[in-house]
Amino acid sequence: MSMEDPFFVVKGEVQKAVNTAQGLFQRWTELLQGPSAATREEIDWTTNELRNNLRSIEWDLEDLDETISIVEANPRKFNLDATELSIRKAFITSTRQIVRDMKDQMSASSVQALAERKNRQALLGDSSSQSWNAGVADRYGRLDRELQLANSHFIEEQQAQQQLIVEQQDEQLELVSGSIGVLKNMSQRIGGELEEQAVMLDDFSHELESTQSRLDNVMKKLAKVSHMTSDRRQWCAIAILFAVLVVVLILFLVL
């Protein structure tokens, strides 16, 4: 959650580069179609800067394509659904179309002819370059102000988007923290109940041992009483037999 998605970092750089390229393209169009004369240096500089920006944007878009391919190969690892992938693909497609449109207009035959004519006019007008310097400085200053304004708007949008992402992450962290608290309370209750049951089992074990000891004592006493009773019965039987023997002897003597 705390790690920033690299796609949004590259996306921000691409959007910033597109804004710069659009400003250069507008200036390049004004130089070719405007009624005022422009020097060859200004036309060449604007053209080269525009082409370099477009080439850099294309490279960044290729990097974004590679990141999407990696995510599509293992979507579970990056936790991105199909909707988010579609949004990212749409951004790449639309940006690539913007770059393609500007390149097509720059490479059009009519535009090339206009650029060559402007270059010839610039070469013919180099003798009056001193009177043009003030106008060039003003145009460059206006272009810089426009670029700075576009960049400031872009930075504000990115900051607002990052703030929204941070707020969403904070909300998710609060939900996770609440769930952890509930689980902690449940685990504490379960632990208390287990401890109570352990105490009850320990008491029951002691009672069982005491009962077993008392039962053993009773069994020993019963065995002792049984042994004593058996001895008494034997003496009684001997006495009866002796009495019978005496009676028989008396009868024998009498008869």
Swiss-Prot record:
Residues 41-74 form a coiled coil. The modification Phosphoserine is found at S2, S129, S152. The keyword Coiled coil applies. GO terms for molecular function: SNAP receptor activity; syntaxin binding. InterPro entries: SNARE (IPR010989), Syntaxin-6/10/61_N (IPR015260), Syntaxin/epimorphin_CS (IPR006012), T_SNARE_dom (IPR000727). One of its GO terms (biological process) is retrograde transport, endosome to Golgi. Pfam families: SNARE (PF05739), STX6_10_61_N (PF09177). Residues 163-225 form the t-SNARE coiled-coil homology domain. Its main location: Golgi. Residues 2-168 are annotated as: Required for interaction with VPS51. It comes from the Eukaryota. SMART domains: t_SNARE. PROSITE patterns: SYNTAXIN (PS00914), T_SNARE (PS50192). Belongs to the syntaxin family. SNARE promoting movement of transport vesicles to target membranes. Targets endosomes to the trans-Golgi network, and may therefore function in retrograde trafficking. Together with SNARE STX12, promotes movement of vesicles from endosomes to the cell membrane, and may therefore function in the endocytic recycling pathway. Identified in a complex containing STX6, STX12 and VAMP4. This complex also includes VTI1A. Binds EEA1. Interacts with VPS45A and GOPC. Interacts with MARCHF2; the interaction promotes MARCHF2-mediated ubiquitination and degradation of CFTR. Interacts with MARCHF3. Interacts with BLTP3B (via C-terminal coiled-coil domain). Interacts with BAIAP3; this interaction is increased in the presence of calcium. Interacts with VPS13B. This is Syntaxin-6. It comes from Mus musculus (Mouse).
